[in-house]
Amino acid sequence: MKMPNTLHSVSISTDFPSPNVESEAADVNEYSSTSKFETLGNQSSTNLGFSNSLQDKWDCWKRDLWSIWWSLSRKATRFYRWLSRSLKWRPVTYETVYPQTYETQMSEPREVTTIVKDLNNGDSFVLNVTEPVDPEFLRANIPPVHRKHLPPRLSLVASPGTIPTRGVVVLEDWINPLLSERCKLLLQSELCNQDSYDCPGYICVYRFEQKNNPSVVLGDSTLIQISRVSDLQRHLREYPKNCAFSRSVLEIFPDPGKTSKPCQVSFKVERLVHKELNEYLSWMQPFTCDSCGSLHENWLQIDSKQWDQIRGVILRWVEYSRVIYA
């Protein structure tokens, strides 16, 4: 009794009439002929179930999104290239930066330069210091410079293609090679120092004598002071008349009677002279004069033999200022 009811319920739920054998065979032949040309993508009207329809839609969306992203990326790349060409930008390249060690730094070639000065027109040259120049090549390209207080040697070190055809002077050649290393370093730092303020002036050497009895107090030695002045007459007028020491001008560098141009960097020349004289001379301790009440400093007590050496030092640095800063 239960079997007919079950069969009857199944037949009702299908809602389709049972086809005959001939029509069913015709449908099978038609489906087999169309399945060769139709695929899952172009059978939009085929009823494949709820889950299969969502998968189809998701695949279509993925294809559309991928095509849109690919098109936009191509357009962005073309726009970046056009903008780089129009603005002359360099494209950003990412390179791997390796940390440098001491061996790699020492193995890499370094470019060392030096600045030299032309004696004729005052032009500056930046030369690459790579290897020593052949003396024959040096003498053939640089004319000899004959001046009284110019250093006798020109230790120019440069590449052969960068040597100028005129006379040049290296700053280290002005330093006395017999000085100590400490004094050489002090002079080199002073030569390389770019002063924010300096003015033309003269290097004046004053001689001091005690008014009461100079020969008894000093004997064969003499008290001198080396300082820069811009107006010599004003310095002589401002010296106190009631001082226990009388002051007179021993010599002026450069000589105003022979040249109309003073020393262009008088403060620098004064410091250079004082630093070099500190090597072999001792300065007197500053003291306050009992008569005039002024402070006397930067005084040297020398003899006649030491004066020739001091004069040569002053002449050399005054000549340096004339050659370099003329």
UniProtKB/Swiss-Prot annotation:
Protein name: Meiotically up-regulated gene 113 protein
Pfam family, one: T5orf172
PANTHER family assigned: MEIOTICALLY UP-REGULATED GENE 113 PROTEIN
Native source organism of the sequence: Schizosaccharomyces pombe (strain 972 / ATCC 24843)
InterPro entries listed in its UniProt record: Meiosis_regulatory, Phage_T5_Orf172_DNA-bd
One biological process term in Gene Ontology: meiotic cell cycle
One MF annotation (Gene Ontology) recorded for this entry: catalytic activity
Keywords attached to this entry: Cytoplasm, Meiosis
GO CC aspect terms: cell division site; cell tip; cytoplasm
Keyword DNA damage attributed: no
Higher taxonomy: Eukaryota, Fungi, Dikarya, Ascomycota, Taphrinomycotina
Predominant cellular place of this UniProt entry's protein: cytoplasm
Its job: Has a role in meiosis.
Compartments it resides in: Cytoplasm
